[in-house]
Amino acid sequence: MKPEEIRVNGKEIFKDEEEEDKDLFWFEKPLVTLLFDYKRWNRPLRYIKNDRFENAVSNKMSQYFFHTCPSDGKKIISFTYPPSLSTIEEIIQKRMSLYTTEKGSPEDLYNNWVYTNKKKKNNLSNELINRIEAIEKGSVSIDVLEKRIRLCHDENEQKCLPKWYDPFFNGPYRGTITKVDSQNEDEHFGEMTWKKKIYDIPHKLKNSQEFEEKRNTFHFNRKLLSTDSNNLFTPIGEFDEELASSFYLKEIFLDSEKKSLYSENQKKNGKQPVDTIKNNSNDQALRKHEIEIEKMNKKLPRWSYKLIDDLEQQEEENPEESTGNPGIRSRKAKRVVIYTDKDQNIHTDTSTDSDQAEEIALIRYSQQSDFRRDLIKGSMRSQRRKTLILEMFQANAHPPLFLDRLNKTSFSFNFSKMSMGKELEFKTANSENAEKREAVIKEKTDKSDRLAIAETWDSVTFAQPIRGCILVAQSIVRKYIILPTLIIGKNLGRILFWQSPEWDEDFHEWKKEMHIKCTYNGVQLSETEFPKAWLTDGIQIKILFPFSLKPWHRSKQTSLQVDPIKVKKQNFCFLTVWGRETEQPFGPPRKNPPFFKPILKELKKEMINRFFRVPKTLKNGTKGFMKVEKEKTTLIIQIVFFLKRKMKEFLFVFVKVNPTPLVRSQKIYESNENEKNSILSNKITYESNIQKKSTIDLKNLSLTEKKIKDLSDHTSIIRNQIERVAKDKKRIYLISDRNPSTGETGWYDKDKGRESKKGIWQIFKKRSTRLIRKWPYFLKSLIQKIYTETLLFTISSTDDYAKFFIESTKKSLNKHIYNDEKDKRVIDEINQNTIEFISTINRSFSNITNIFNNSNKNSLTYFELFSLSQAYVFLKLSQTQVFNLYCLGSLLQYHGASTLFKKKIKDYLGSQGIFNFKLKQKKLQNSGINDWKNWLRSHYQYNLPKIRWSRIVPQKWRNRINERRTIKKKGSIFSHSYAKENDQFIYYKKQKNFRMNSLTNQKEKLKKHYRYDLSSYKYLHYEELKNSPLISRSPFQIKGGQEIPYNYNNYNRPKYESFFYVPEIIAINDYLIMGEYVFNTDKNRDRKYLDWGILNLGFKKNINIEYWTHMDTRPFSQDTRTRSNDYRVVENKNLFFLRIHQEINPSNQKNTLFDWMGMNEEMLYYSISSIEPWFFPEFVPRYDIYKIKPCIIPIKSLFLNFYGKESISKNINVNRKANHDTSSNFKKYPVFKNINQEEKEGQGQEVLRSNAQNQQKSFIEKDYKESDIQKPRTKAQSKNNKETELDSFLKKYLLFQLRWNNSLNQKVIDNIKVYSLLLRLKNPREIAISSIQRGEMRLDVMLFQKDITLSGLIKGGLLVIEPIRLYLKWDFQFFMYQIVGISLVHKDKQQIKTRCRIKEYVDKMDFDGSFLPYGKTLVKGHEKHYDLLVPEHILSPRRRRELRILMSFNSGKENIMGRGPFILNGKSVRNCEPFFYEDKYLDTDANKFIQFKFFLWPNYRLEELACMNRYWFDSNNGSRFSMLRIRMYPRHRIL
C-alpha cells in the first residue's frame, strides 16, 4: 500500500514518516514541540469532517493573527491575517536581507493602487462598450454575449456535469468523477495491473533479503541488457542484477497461462505496456506518475490527527486498531452492554472469532441539553447570543421567535349548547378528573426530580464509583445481615410471648428475594453478573420479591383476600444508597409495611373489648332478670288458677246446700246469654247440662260416691276450660273490651281486666326484645338515609348556585351586548383610540348597509374586533364588494370620489388617516407620504389575510365563518338574518371570555416580544429603505372595470390550480384560499432557510406556478373553453423545461426567463420530519422538503427568452408555418440544440433528469467506495434492506439523531430490560409470568410485523428522524430572485382594451430594430414584461461583479442619485429617483413599471459574498450576516 499523504503547514509528509516521529523518545524531541504542539488546531471551532475522508480538512481561514497587510492601497493592521503567509514573508525578507530595497511612500502605494483599479475599470468599460457597438452594427447577439464555460462529459455536449461538480462553476471538487468506457474496461484493467506490479518491484527489491543474497553472487553486463530490444528490465536499471528474471518476474507472470499479457499485434509492433519509468530511489516520481494515470486529485491541508468522538471509539470492532483518545466532544452518552452471547455452538461461520463474544449494547444519552456540538477538546467555545431554555432537560436550543413549532396546549375549554336554554355543560379537552390530573402532574415532577438526581451523580467527579460500591455493600448487608437478624429477633419474641415461632415461613420468603444487578438505566442482567465498567458507568440493584418482616403469617384463605394491586406494587423495588427501597431508580423511598402496626391494632382491639365488658355484663344481667320475672309470672298465673279452682269447689258445696240462689244465678246467667260470645254460651250450657245430669244421679247413689264423682267431673271441666282459655286467650281479650252495664257485673269481669294487663306486659316485653336485636340495623339504615338526604340536598343546592351563576353571567353578557348596541348609535368625534376606531368602522359598514340595502339580510359577520391590526382593516376595506357594498368597493378600485357617501363618514375616515379627501375631491391622496402605512403594507406580518384572523377564534366559530364567508346575492337562500348573526356574536363573546380567562402561555408571550422587537428595529431604519421596491406600491388601487373574483375558489377548478390563482392587486400572502396546498407564511417561517417568496412545496408532479398566476386574469365573459388545457403541458416536463405562458389561443406561446422561485423541481423525497403540525398540516412535507433540498434554480442564458416561440410538448398545437423562420434560426446556434430535440422526443427531458439523478448517485457511491474510513470487519456481516433504507434516509442530513416515539420507546425499553434478565436465567418461567402480571413485559410489543418498512415506521410516527440542518450558501440566482420576486408576484396583468399588444423585447437577430426607449414594440400579443435588455448582462456574472466593485471604490465622492440622464441609443430616459416620489402605484401602470424596472437592474445589486470580508464576522455559519446592512451598488455610466 502506498503511504498516506498528509499536508501539515505547507509540507507533505507521509504516514511512514509520522510513525517514525512517534517512535522517538520524549527527550529526543525539541523542547518547543514538548511544550507546544505545532500541529494542533487553533480555530475553527468545528472539526470539518465527512465520511468520505479519513482525516478532516484543516480550515485556517478564520483565526486571530495580527499582521500588517495592504488594503485599499494602504497598510492596515489585520487581526485575521493567515499565519502561514506571514511566515513565508519573514523567510523571504531574511533571504533578501543582503540586498538593499527601497520602500515607497504610502502615497505612491495608494496612487499605484488607484491607477491600477482605474485601468482595470476602463478596460472592462471599453470591452462592454465594444460589445454594445457590435450589437448596434448588426452582429449576431449570441456571439456578442460573454459566455461561461461548462464542463461536459458527453461527446454531443448535451450532458453537462451538475453545478456542484462543475469546476468552472463551483471550483475544484474534492471527490473524483471517473467514467470508464465499458469496451476498453478490460484492457484498461489489464494495463493498470501491469503498471502497478511493475511499480511495486523497486519497493519490494529494496526490502528483500533474498535480493541482498543474490546481489553478491550474480553479476552481468549492463550494456548487454540495454541493447536487448525486448528488455523489460529498463525500469530497474539502477539495480543491474539478474534477480528480476528469476525472482520477482514470476509474480508478474503468474496468470500468463490464462491470459496473454498483450496481444500479438502489440508484439509485432514492439509496443510495451509501459513506455518509460524514471528511476527514483524515493519512489516520488513513480507515485506521481501513478496518480496521473489513475485520477486527478487536489491535495488539501488536513489535520495530522485523525480525531474521533467518544461513540466512535466505543463502537470500534477492533480495539487494537484504536486511534487513541477521542478528540471530539460528542453528546454525553454511554454504551451499555445488555447481553453477551457466549454460546459458541450457535455460530456456524468459520470466519468469526470464536474467542470474541457477540455483544448487544444500548447507547444511554444524557438528559441534559447538548451544547457541545462536536467541539474539539481544548478549543475555545464560540460566544453566541443567549438562548432561552423552557424545559428542564431540552435536547436542542430553540430561538424564542420559532417557539410556535413547539406549542402544545394541554388544556382548553369548549362551550357546548345550552340544554333547555338554562344549563351549560363545561367540557375539557381531557376527560380526566382533578385527581387524575394531579396524579399526572405528580408523576411528571417525580420524573424530573429523578432525572436531576441522576445527572447530579453523573456530573460529580468519582461519584459513580462511590455510589456503586455503596450499593453493593448495602445489598450484601441487607441480604445476609439485616434480614436474618430481623427474622431471628421476631421468632424469639414469639417464643417469649408463648406463641409458636415461624422459622420456615420467614426463611422461605427470605430465600425468594433476588438482588438483580442492572445497568445505570435499569436494564436487568443477573444476580451474579455485573455490568461492564460498572464503576465508571454506574449500577442499579433491583430487588425482586422484596422481603418484608411480618408479625405473623396468615392462612391461605385469608391471603387470597388481599388486594392484588398491593401485591403487584410490592413485587420489586430498587435499592438506594441509604439501604431503602424505591419504586424507580433515583426515586423517593417508599414506605415499607410496618411490623408493629398489626400488633398494636390487635392490642387496641383487646383493650376495647376489656373496656366495654361492663355493658356486656349489664346486658347479660338484664336478660337473666327478665327470665326470672318471666318464671315468676308463670308461677303467679298458676297460683291464680289454683285459687279459682278452689273457689269453684267452694261454690259447688254452697250450691248444694242452698239450691235456690244457684237457680237464680243461673237465670241471670241465661238472661245474658244472648249478649255473650258463642264460646261462653256453649260453656255455660254445657255446665248446666252436667249439673242436671248429676242431680238425677244423686237419687240413686250414695252421698260419698256422689262427692267423688262431682269432684272428678268438676276437675275435668276446669282442665278443659283452662286449655280453651290458653288457646283463645287473645280472642277473649279482644271481645272483653266492652264495659258492662250497671247491674250486669259478674265474677268474670275482674278476671278479664287481670288478663288484659298481663297481655300488655307480654307485648311490651316481646317488642323491647325485638328492638334490642334489630337496633344496629336500624341505626345503620338511619345513617344511610340521613347521608342520602344530605347529599341530595347538597347537589340540588349546587345546581341552584350554578343556575344562578349562569343566569347572572348571561344577564351581564346581555347587558354588555345591549350597551354595545346602544353605543353604536353614537360616534365620539373627540377622543378615539384604536379599539373605538375599529369598532366605528364596523358600525359605519353596518350603517352603509342599512342605507343602501334597507334590510338586515346581508349584515356583516361579527368577528374578533379587539385582536385585529389596522392593516387588516385596510384589507377589508378594499374587499368590501364581497359584502355587496358596491359603493365603497368602487371608491377603492379607481381614482375618484363617490357622491353617495355622507360627509360625516368621509370626514371621519379622513381624520383617521385612511382617506384624506373632501366631497369634491376627484383623486385619492398619495399614500406614499405616510411612511408607517407603507411600512405596514410591505411586511407580511401586518398584511393579514382572512385565514390569519380566523385562527384567533375557536374552531366551531371559525368553521361557521368559513362556511358563511361567501355572501351570495341579495335575497339568496344562503343569506342569514340579523338575529341569527347577533346570536352567533353572543355565543362567540362567551367563548372569547373563557378563552381570555384561561392561563396565558409563556411561549406565546416570549414570541410576541421578540416579534415586536424585530419589527421595531426594522421600522427605525425604515428611512434608509423607503426607496426599496418592497414598499413601492399600494394595495388599494385597482384599474377601473376590473373585478376582484374574491370567491373564485367556488368555480370548478383543480385544487392546485385554485391555490395559485392570485388577483391583480392582492399579494400572494393576502389571498390564501383554504385548499389542499395552502400554507401560512407568517406563523411557521424560518428566516434562516426560508424566504417569503421562495417556497419549495414539493409537488409530486411538475407544476408551472408562474403560469397559473397569469391564468384567468381576463374578465370572465371571455371564452373559457381553453382553460381545460391550461395545465396539461406541464406534467411531462422536468426541472429545466422552458416556461410556457397561456394566451387566449393555446398555440400562441412564448418562453420567459424565470423559473418562478424554483418550484418546478420534482419532489424526490417524502416528508420525514417530526415537526408538529402547522395550522395547515398538508404543507408540513413541503416545508420539510425545502429544508432538506433547497431550491435549485438552473442558470440559463439571460437572452434565452428573447428568441421567439418554442414548441415544448406534442400536446400543444403550434402553427409551424408562422414559426418556420424562427425554428430555422434556432438550429444555427448550439444553445438551442436541446430545444429542437425536445420537439422530436417528447420524453427527452425525463431521460435527462433520470440520468442526472443516476450520475449524482453514482458520484456518491464512488466517493463512498473510495473512502478510507471503512474498516475491515472481523465478522461476516451484510446490511439488510432496512439498514440500506435507513442509510438512504440519513444521507440527506449531515447531523441527525434517531429516536422512537415516546410511548413506544418506553414499552420497548421495558421489554428489553426484561429480556436481558430472562436470557440469563435457567428457569425464567416464574419471572416471565411475574413480569407480564406487573406490566413490565408487554406482549403486543413482542409481535413483529414482517412486511414493515422504514418509511412505514416514519409515516406511522413510531420512528422519528430529528435532523439538525445547516445553513445554506446562497448563490447569485438567489439574490437575483430576491430583487425581482415581488415584482413577479405583483405585476399588473390587466386586460388591455386596445388591440395593440406587447411583443418580445428583443428580436431574433437585430437588437437595434426592436429596442425602443422603454424596451418594447407595439404589436399584437399579450403583455409580458418580465425582463429587459440590460447592457450589463452582456458580461458574465464574474466580470459583471468585478466591474461593479471597481466602480464602487469612488462612489462615495459622487452624488449618484443626482446624475444626469442616462443615454442609450440617443434616447433620454429619466433617472430612477423620481419614481419613488411621483407615484407609488408602479405595478398598476405598465409603462411606469417598465421604466422603473429598467433602472432597477443595473442600479441595485445585493452585495455578494465575494465583496464581503469574511474576517469581519469570524464565523462560518453565517449567523451574524443578519446584522449586516446590505449595500446597494450604484449603476454605471455609459458615455
Swiss-Prot record:
GO BP: any one term: protein transport
Keyword list, A-Z: Chloroplast, Plastid, Protein transport, Transport
Superkingdom classification of source: Eukaryota
Sequence segments annotated as region (Disordered): 264-283, 312-333, 1263-1282
Disulfide bonds: none
Subcellular location per the Swiss-Prot or TrEMBL entry: Plastid, Chloroplast
Family statement: Belongs to the TIC214 family.
Protein name listed in UniProt: Putative protein TIC 214 C-terminal part
Species name: Piper cenocladum
Gene, per the UniProt record: TIC214
